[in-house]
Amino acid sequence: MSRTTDRRGGRDDSLQVVVVDDSPFMRGLISDLLTDAGVAVVGEAGDGAEALSVVAETRPDVVTMDVEMPGMGGLEAVERLMDETPTPVLMLSAHTAEGAEVTFEALERGAVDFFSKPGGEVSAGVSRESDRLVEAVRSVAGADLAAATRDRRERDAAGGGPSAAASGASTPSASAASADLDGPLTVVIGASTGGPNAVERVMSALPTADCRIVIVQHMPEAFTPRFADRLDEASAYDVREASDGARIGSGEALVARGGSHTRIDSYRSGRLRVNLDEDDSQSVTPAADVTMRSAAEVVDGPLVGVVLTGMGSDASEGIRAMADAGARTIAQSEDTCVIYGMPKRAVETGGVDEVCDLDDVAGAIVGGEA
């Protein structure tokens, strides 16, 4: 049964959340974790239909939404919510391949980000990740909903899927792009919140050229293989998840594996090799800083660093290192970011050459002088 609540906790009433899950136990657990961190839980719901009513009544800052629920599930609820009472949504997803697939669909429908529940419904796993859950909720609260729902609105207008939404991006032709490249181009892209849709948009608009690309998206290990598959389907590039010792050349891309850092280990004759490690000194894994710094140290050919939407400061040190090594550097504009965190911090280092709207990033990658 849907209900409003008063779990304000006494520390910080500025952030208000509605918790949606078909399991009363999970609703209580998530609500208690948020309340203990000073987040006000102002409502709960057991399915999507109830969620629509509670959100309309309470007008929260964030909704945490389970995916699989009886009646109206999370996917339909997200879409209806964006139409009726637009509110930032954090999906709570099972830590499985199936959970990854439905989560990407939820992001396409307007959800801002997702929290992967360790072990699916195992409550102890969620408790161990309480700090990460609270951080995710706070991050989502600051999202630009217009940017988060842009792909869906354009897809609906075009009457097609994500590729139809991306087709409006202005990019040079493949032949023009190749003519602009002074030798093999290596590209490192870093992103976090809002990144899956943004990276897909850039990759689908990027023309075939003599590029090799490494993508670092903050994402758990169970999700990165499917993310690589989606990019492979959406773009002209051969995209796969990074593995230890993997090599790529022209027209190929790697997605950093969740749970490991991807370091560029060597670069010879236009081909680069990566190694994976589990260094826990970084605040996030995988970290764009690690990949970007290694690119700056190893790649002696034309090099481009790109920072897309995301919370936090990852990629700021890496983009500075790439700039110091002579790379061209690009950051996504505030107006088109779901979260203007990572690009903002990158710009503040003084190491960003160009700030671009999302639809101009692909053209900037291949159109400048490296």
What spans do the regions from the language model cover?
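Extreme N-terminal starter segment of soluble prokaryotic enzymes
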Residues: 13-16
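Conserved acid/base catalytic micro-environments in cytosolic active-site loops
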Residues: 3-7, 11, 24-32, 44, ...
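A generic structural motif
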Residues: 37-42, 58, 209-212
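Negatively charged
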Residues: 65
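Conserved acidic carboxylate
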Residues: 21
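Acidic, metal-coordinating helix/loop segments flanking the phosphotransfer/catalytic sites
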Residues: 44-62
